[in-house]
């Protein structure tokens, strides 16, 4: 549903474009904001389609893609994470977002099962962490974090701390490696 009023959406958009920083975690990328197209276009980059069900939470291999980015400082090249994995209509890479991490779709069962219904949620290119420049502001989205246990995992905590640091202290967007 509509979480913010039109006025609040406009204020948030202006603040972010003027140099603010936004960190979206897990459900920030679902379809609860689908009526706010600016949000989808600038922060998520793709429309949510579904999450896995069968089982709902699965271990998968997360593969880093842009190790030079400050959000990935001290994050290993690959790591295992249990999550309710999301899928989107397309990869946000198509819209020019900086992809920081993707899923190895061979490492889990990307399907949605419910009674006799089964839907394949493979994307081929399946990002789960990405960044974007929005005017003079920055955004990072991580599709992980459904369960509290995610925040007990040292690698995920490091990624979130790095993201917050980049969002607060970065002087320029886009990030250009030295």
Descriptions of predicted regions:
Residues 106-178:
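Extracellular ligand-binding/catalytic regions of CAZymes and related secreted enzymes
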Residues 16, 21-26, 72-73, 98-101, ...:
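Structural recognition of the beta-strand scaffold that forms the well-ordered cores
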Residues 2-74:
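A glycine-rich, often tryptophan-bearing local segment used as a flexible ligand/cofactor-contacting loop or short
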Residues 23, 50, 82, 171-175:
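Secondary-structure transition/capping residues
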Residues 15, 22, 36-38, 79, ...:
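A residue-identity detector for tryptophan
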Residues 39-45, 81, 90-97, 145, ...:
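Oxidoreductase and adenylate-handling cofactor-binding alpha/beta cores
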Residues 54-135:
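Catalytic beta-strand/loop cores that center a nucleophilic Ser/Cys/Thr
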